[in-house]
Amino acid sequence: LGFSKGNNIGVQHAKGEYLCILNPDTVVPEDCFKELFEFSEIKNDLGLFACRLIDGTGTFLPESKRHIPTPKVAIKKMLGFIKSYYATEVEEDSTGIVPILVGAFMMVKTNVYKQVQGFDEDYFMYGEDIDLSYKVTKAGYDNMYYGPIKAIHFKGESTLKDSVYAKRFYGAMQIFYKKHFKSNRLTKTIISLGIKMAKLFKGHTSVEKMPVNRYVLISDKNYPKLAEIFKNSFQIQTKIEVFQANTQVILDANYLSFKQIIECMSASEKNQNITFKILPKNSNFILGSNSSKNRGEVIHF
């Protein structure tokens, strides 16, 4: 079906005042929607709105807030100057108007979504969130980024980080420029260069596996089968604290709220090789992702 068509079908069956577009590889805190709803009620002319996204290591995902990828911005992005692509003028933990939000998690009033005719089904995958954000802005609404709320987007599970991704992205930009910008030699050159550069990608980029010296389960319960997997390097504690370098932290959702889990991941030292796994409620497996560039891992016990 593709991302656009699949979501539009869902919207046809939705009956609420608000719509939430949410990827399956996400984790949201318990108070997420309550806080976003309260925020939406005090903002006039609200278009799309969304929260801060982090990856499976707790690292902020800059695509949470972006600028319109005009031909000039696209050229800079291809040359490695990404500051103009991301909306860095809005701090990641603050709130502000941004042109483009990410399709992994966005909310919008149903009437606004239908007014701009929803996701454009000419896009199969990639670019549809840019197109929707741009249409909503052109209709006179403000797209809002709400940084106080954080959610996890594992990302590597729904994104192809290789030549296929690059080709699809620049193909989507070709559609975007045809629909919203006057076609000229410059835009055609940008797309042509983007597609040519995509062919130079050598496929999936592996991320170096970092050493893990200890495994710490945050829980009030013992899981003997889980302990067997990690042997002598496994320990259990009930409090979240500052972890030593090269530690993998296993967060038990039977004991911790998702808000606590997300806060723990977000607050971790990013240069200490602290990684995370989540033990979902009533489950016999842990899962997580040590890089937004690679697929995650599921360990059964």
Regions flagged by a language model, labelled:
Residues 93, 99-149, 265-266:
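A short, conserved alpha-helix in the catalytic core of glycosyltransferases
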Residues 1, 26-27, 123:
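Acidic metal-phosphate-binding loop of nucleotide-sugar-dependent transferases
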Residues 68-98:
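Short, flexible, basic/aromatic active-site loop/helix in glycosyltransferases
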